[in-house]
Regions:
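Metal-dependent catalytic neighborhoods of phosphoester/phosphodiester hydrolases
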Residues: 134-144, 303-304
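Cap/insert and terminal regions of metallo-dependent hydrolase folds
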Residues: 98-105, 109, 232, 236-324
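Active-site glycine- and acidic-residue-rich loops that bind
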Residues: 134-136, 221-233
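Metallo-beta-lactamase
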Residues: 1-116, 120-132, 148-224, 242-248, 272-288
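Active-site metal-binding loops of divalent metal-dependent hydrolases
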Residues: 27-28, 86-89, 129, 159-160, ...
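Short, P/G- and charge-enriched loop/turn segments at secondary-structure junctions
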Residues: 57-63, 142-143, 222-223
Length: 324
């Protein structure tokens, strides 16, 4: 990701999954992400080979650039209002990532356009504790970071929280999870715990959990998919026989469905991230679940299918999903 797009308004896109309504809340869009920077092991010939299988809204063959974004997913289900990941947030100092540094976006207006105020959110579910997934947990008020979703229970990995707290000097470093994650290539950004999670915990709004697949609310569960971060999770929603998977940073672009071996520059433990990606791709292809991405452009939602020995990604639009 190399350049922030304009902050022009985007209409909310909504999908039906059983009795649940899932709505995208956009934050940022890029149309000129450099694939060589995002995927250090990718060569131009390989991109050209798969470019014909990527849709025009995700890859521009004339420029060789990728389209990406950041967004949240708003879920209305079983009488609850649920927000899955909270994007980057405004005013957050992120000097090591200029495209995320001290943003000023109309995210809250887009949430309002979807018919929800922060006070109406019951649950905030965090797939992992990275800057572009937890930022709107808090807002700057009187020079202090205050929780935005003041009625919501914020649910996240205990291991992720301890790891992030240690990074910011609030706790000793935790033991790694039992699985061997391999060598850490990319440390997480500092200060994310300080400005985006600790204020929530201090306000009594946090709930740290084990990522073990157990249901945490009606039809909602966290499933282990480590590697991109130390205890990264895929969140699954089951409703009336249908499934939605919120895959977060299992993939950063549809290209990785075709090339699951590609590591992103942002993955902390790339070998484990690849193993998790291959596992999620295989399970998603078998289940037929509707997958909701964290950084894909276009609708952000799609299905994974088998493609010879590998996989393919097909975007799903709300009209195509209307019968669900």
């Amino acid at each position: 990701m190399t350049q922030q797009s304009s902050n022009s308004a985007e209409p909310p896109l909504s999908f039906r999954v059983g009795d649940a309504l899932v709505t995208r809340i956009p934050e940022l869009r890029w149309t000129n992400a450099d694939p060589a920077r995002l995927y250090p092991d990718l060569d131009a010939a390989a991109l050209g080979a798969y470019g014909s299988q990527l849709s025009a809204g995700s890859y521009n063959p004339d420029t060789g650039k990728l389209a990406q974004g950041t967004h949240s997913w708003l879920v209305r289900h079983a009488g609850r209002v649920i927000l899955i990941d909270t994007a980057t947030g405004n005013d957050k100092p992120r000097p090591s990532a200029p495209m995320l540094d001290r943003l000023d976006t109309p995210y809250l207006s887009r949430l309002a356009a979807a018919g929800v105020t922060p006070e109406q959110v019951d649950l905030v579910l965090l797939t992992h504790i990275h800057a572009d997934h937890v930022g709107w947990n808090t807002v700057l008020q009187d020079n202090t970071w205050q929780p935005l979703f003041t009625r919501a229970r914020h649910v996240y990995s205990e291991t992720e929280a301890r790891y992030a707290a240690a990074l910011d000097g609030f706790a000793p470093a935790p033991d790694l999870p039992p699985a061997d994650l391999g060598r850490a290539d990319h440390p997480p950004m500092p200060q994310v715990y300080t400005d985006s999670l600790k204020p929530v915990i201090d306000a009594g709004l946090g709930q740290a959990i084990a990522i073990d697949g157990k249901e945490i609310a009606d039809g909602l569960s966290f499933h282990p998919a480590p590697g991109h971060s130390i205890d990264h999770a895929v969140i699954r929603l089951r409703s009336r026989g249908e499934e939605a998977w919120f895959i977060a940073d299992i993939m950063h672009h549809p290209l990785q469905a075709y090339r699951p071996d590609l590591r992103s520059v942002y993955c902390e433990f790339p070998k484990t991230a690849e193993q998790s990606r291959r596992g999620v791709l295989a399970q998603a292809a078998e289940s037929g679940a509707l997958c909701f991405s964290a950084h894909f452009a276009e609708s952000g939602a799609g299905r994974i299918t088998r493609n010879g020995p590998g996989f393919a990604w097909k975007f799903v639009n709300p009209k195509e999903n209307s019968a669900s």
